[in-house]
């Protein structure tokens, strides 16, 4: 029984993650150039940056991916720390959309949605329609995965040992937060963790009083991806990743100390008896309240971050400024950044030609040295661009 349950849960979770990725890829392809324009233009205003973070995370389907992308922008000098923190706030809210979707039992419609997507994909040659069809296919697979995960976990409600374990250890705040952190660290997706909690709740083995602690840990665990990604970046890139961790840890602390009971009462009053919906709502409310509470203190938090990781002289930078792998999650922006590097390479080539001609005419050794340096830089540009 345990083997069957485990394999079924793994299969369901895999379908859930694949569907989420496919839907996100489709949304991103459809958004395309519009996504690039939104990020570039609207992040100049900090409040609008929050909305941009929500929108982009809804498209990408991952707050971790959004934060990693923002770390890349800051590292490449395309975004300031002040702009980035607003996007991070919004990403935390945007990532709750997936949990809201899967908390509704729409699995009976999933085959129809997949069929519609497949028909549209096969019958049209329009690339935009094909891209949009991926959204429907991913949406359907996501719900089939959720249904499979829930069905696989059904035997748990017949196991009193599991129920007793949940009641005994789940009520401990620190163990609950640790479980949530570990789950998200392993799954690398806060949405997947919420999906597992909703699947457990649908089988009646996870009360909301226990789930909220795991949700708090889930929000801390989602920061690990950006933290790891920031290790090879500039100081400002590291500051963005640390800011993400800081706001989620602060939110967890004051919710655990003062607002946990209120949060449970609110979500129970919104959807009495439906723990799956309560979990999704708790996840959303936590992140919205955290933005409302901490956003007014953004400047103070930035100063604190800069004390922990002070601004200073950076290590010797690569000749390329815009080629950051973290930005590859948004191909349209990554491609535009490559064009910037081509322009810089062309400028370097022009300088090389000018210095070479000057050296040939005047026999000036300084111009020869400059021309050789230009050649070295051109080779570095070529190598970096081709690799990217």
Predicted regions and their residues:
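Helix-loop-helix hairpins and the membrane-proximal interhelical loops
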Residues: 2-46, 136-182, 200
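C-terminal ends of transmembrane helices
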Residues: 20-29, 70-75, 116-130, 226-233
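Membrane-spanning helices that line or support transport/gating and their immediate boundary helices
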Residues: 22-30, 34, 38, 100, ...
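Alpha-helical transmembrane segments of multi-pass membrane proteins, especially transporters
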Residues: 33, 37, 41, 45, ...
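Membrane-interfacial helix-loop connectors
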Residues: 59-60, 68-95, 100-109, 117-121, ...
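Cytosolic, long alpha-helical scaffolding segments
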Residues: 104-106, 206, 214, 232-238, ...
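Core mid-bundle transmembrane helix pairs that form the ion/substrate translocation pathway
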Residues: 118-179, 246-250, 279-298
């Amino acid at each position: 029984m345990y083997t069957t349950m485990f394999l079924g849960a793994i299969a369901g979770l895999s379908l859930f993650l694949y569907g989420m990725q496919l839907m996100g890829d489709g949304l991103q392809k459809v958004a395309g150039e519009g996504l690039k324009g939104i990020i570039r233009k609207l992040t100049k205003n900090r409040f609008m940056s929050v909305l941009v973070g929500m929108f982009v995370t809804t498209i990408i389907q991952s707050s971790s991916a959004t934060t990693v992308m923002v770390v890349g922008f800051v590292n490449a000098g395309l975004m300031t720390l002040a702009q980035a923190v607003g996007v991070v706030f919004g990403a935390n809210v945007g990532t709750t959309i997936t949990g809201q979707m899967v908390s509704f039992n729409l699995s009976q419609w999933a085959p129809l949605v997949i069929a519609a997507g497949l028909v549209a994909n096969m019958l049209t040659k329009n690339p935009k329609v094909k891209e949009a069809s991926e959204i429907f296919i991913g949406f359907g697979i996501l719900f089939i995965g959720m249904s499979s995960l829930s069905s696989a976990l059904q035997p748990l409600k017949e196991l009193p040992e599991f129920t007793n374990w949940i009641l005994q250890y789940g009520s401990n705040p620190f163990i609950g937060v640790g479980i949530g952190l570990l789950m998200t660290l392993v799954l690398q997706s806060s949405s997947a963790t919420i999906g597992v909690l909703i699947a457990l709740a649908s089988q009646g083995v996870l009360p909301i009083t226990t789930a909220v602690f795991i949700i708090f840990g889930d929000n801390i665990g989602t920061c690990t991806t950006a933290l790891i990604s920031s290790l090879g970046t500039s100081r400002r890139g590291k500051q963005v990743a640390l800011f993400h961790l800081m706001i989620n840890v602060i939110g967890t602390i004051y919710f655990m100390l003062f607002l946990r009971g209120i949060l449970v009462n609110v979500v129970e009053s919104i959807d009495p008896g439906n723990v799956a919906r309560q979990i999704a709502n708790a996840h959303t409310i936590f992140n919205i309240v955290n933005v409302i509470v901490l956003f007014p203190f953004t400047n103070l938090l930035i100063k604190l971050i800069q004390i922990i990781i002070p601004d200073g002289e950076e290590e010797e930078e690569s000749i390329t400024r815009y080629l950051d792998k973290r930005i590859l999650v948004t191909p349209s922006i990554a491609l535009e950044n490559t064009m910037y590097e081509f322009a810089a390479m062309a400028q370097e080539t022009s300088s090389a030609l000018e210095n070479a001609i000057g050296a040939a005419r005047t026999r000036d050794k300084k111009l020869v040295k400059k021309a050789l340096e230009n050649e070295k830089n051109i080779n570095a540009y070529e190598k970096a661009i081709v690799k990217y």
